[in-house]
Amino acid sequence: MIYGIGTDIIKIDRIAAALGRHGDRFAERILGKEELEKYHRRKAKVEARGLRFLATRFAAKEAFSKAIGLGIHMPMTWRAAQILNAPSGKPIVVTSGKLAEFMQENGLTAQVSITDEVEYAVAFVIVEKK
């Protein structure tokens, strides 16, 4: 049964501006450990790839927070939800800490779809209740 849906679109220039103002501290605030490692690897190869990666993760976390009905409020924090990849490459939501407990206690699972183009990053999340 569908528990909630969420979508988010962000102009990639907004993420670039935030990075310009705050540097990598902005990425460190938004990304979990595994995401941050991937961000740095992508950014080191091609800066635009790192920027698009950060924008898609930002959009996905916003969409996820809407789908679970909490917004960015405890137990939902930026780093408690990571958007990682299954071995197939499919993006997946991986939660930790109090957010993982919330998901388990409520019998919730999430599916995420992300995409980006030159100007925008978009994410769509469906949260299902078992």
UniProtKB/Swiss-Prot annotation:
GO terms for MF: holo-[acyl-carrier-protein] synthase activity; magnesium ion binding
Class of the enzyme per the UniProt entry, highest EC level: transferase
Per the entry, which co-factors are needed? Mg(2+)
Q: Which residues lie in coiled coils?
A: none
Q: Which domain of life is it from?
A: Bacteria
**This enzyme's EC code(s):** 2.7.8.7
Q: Is the keyword Nucleotidyltransferase in the record?
A: no
Presence of the UniProt keyword Signal in the record: no
List residues binding Mg(2+): D8, E62
User: Which reaction equations make up its catalytic activity?
Assistant: apo-[ACP] + CoA = holo-[ACP] + adenosine 3',5'-bisphosphate + H(+)
Gene Ontology cellular component terms for the protein in this record: cytoplasm
- Cellular location(s): Cytoplasm
The GO annotation for biological process reads:
fatty acid biosynthetic process
Mind listing the UniProt keywords for this protein, alphabetically? Cytoplasm, Fatty acid biosynthesis, Fatty acid metabolism, Lipid biosynthesis, Lipid metabolism, Magnesium, Metal-binding, Transferase
Family as reported in the entry's similarity comment: Belongs to the P-Pant transferase superfamily. AcpS family.
> What is the purpose of this protein?
Transfers the 4'-phosphopantetheine moiety from coenzyme A to a Ser of acyl-carrier-protein.
Q: Any idea what this protein is called? A: Holo-[acyl-carrier-protein] synthase
Upper classification of the organism: Bacteria, Pseudomonadati, Pseudomonadota, Betaproteobacteria, Burkholderiales
